[in-house]
């Protein structure tokens, strides 16, 4: 009996390595490559390292992003103690520009059918006339040397890697596999694990070669947090620009309709989110400054109508500010289409604002013509709201228009109180506090 028990114990110990599962982590990176993307890579790789995983697979879909963030990510991948597999997924995804460098810096590259890789020419953003600023030869040559070294280190086709920059070359999965740029074409994670099982890859941090063992594997997914999703969304330059624009207009609406507070609150939140997005993606502070100046022009037009002078100045400043927003000299590794789409958005928003103010100015002109015909008789008796304390002079809003006003009895009338127009002195309304019983103390 004792021999039987001992035999069973020995069999259990011998079987335990066979029963043990190889852990593979899967994480998703989607959107612009920013400094926050590096934080995601670092967090995901660290989790996999701590669990002594067989590998970590990063599902990548990106149009590119900042060069400095990309290089930090590549460095983190090459310092990893376990294999990092870049999987361009799902179908329709791309590892463009900065994404290509990240893929070439990984230990194994896989692509799903219908994806693409390549087009890595560095650009510097937008010029004042709206054209894309190409990187000077010195910077371009640096990135050519960098991408070739990444390809050579991993035994991939350095000539094609160079053409990703010099010819803005893009490849399908089948072409990339044929030219020795990637190792696997797979429809899903299961097919990727099956095809890459037994492949050898070099771990630069210790110089050793590792044979991937994806038999008896346990796949663990690292779901993106709410913060990951939010940052990924607002670092899209189109989204960040819209948030900034809508936020500014919400502040203007709140400024012109005091006492409600909702537009100011929503606008402030939008602007904060836009600033966070710009902070991760990179921006030109001159562009932000011009957009703020444009906002001041619009507010000035609303408070002291100049029949279009401040509006035109605001629109021109607003569009130039938007164009310069991404022309701060940072090296961007993104598809040119990203900046082209942004330019279209800036022009479209500018056109909408122009149309809005054209109709707005027409309404103001009609209102002023009407006032000129009717005189003060039409104003007397109207009820308004104090928007700037009368002590004895201030501002009130009557029929949705801002007017300079003066208390008839030189008393103080608080902001938010109702007043009645009793006379006019030039363009200044003479008012009294509106009370149920009438009169003013």
UniProtKB/Swiss-Prot annotation:
InterPro entries: ClpP/crotonase-like_dom_sf (IPR029045), Membrane_assoc_protease (IPR052165), NA-bd_OB-fold (IPR012340), NfeD-like_C (IPR002810), NfeD1b_N (IPR056738), NfeD_membrane (IPR056739), PH1510-N (IPR033853). One of its GO terms (molecular function) is serine-type peptidase activity. One of its GO terms (cellular component) is membrane. Optimum pH is 5-6. Belongs to the peptidase S14 family. It is found in: Membrane. The chain crosses the membrane at residues 239-259, 271-291, 307-327, 344-364. Homodimer. Keywords: Hydrolase, Membrane, Protease, Serine protease, Signal, Transmembrane, Transmembrane helix. The active site is at 97 (nucleophile), 138 (proton donor/acceptor). Coiled coil: none annotated. Inhibited by divalent metal cations, including Mg(2+), Mn(2+), Ca(2+) and Zn(2+). Mildly inhibited by 0.01 % SDS and 0.1% dodecyl-beta-D-maltoside. Activity is nearly abolished by 1 % SDS. Protease that cleaves its substrates preferentially near hydrophobic or aromatic amino acid residues. Can degrade casein and the stomatin homolog PH1511 (in vitro). Its EC number is 3.4.21.-. This is Membrane-bound protease PH1510. Optimum temperature is above 90 degrees Celsius. It is a multi-pass membrane protein. Residues 1-20 form the signal peptide. The keyword rRNA-binding does not apply. Substrate binds at residues 64-67, 119-124. One of its GO terms (biological process) is proteolysis. Changing residue 62 to A: Reduces enzyme activity by over 90%.
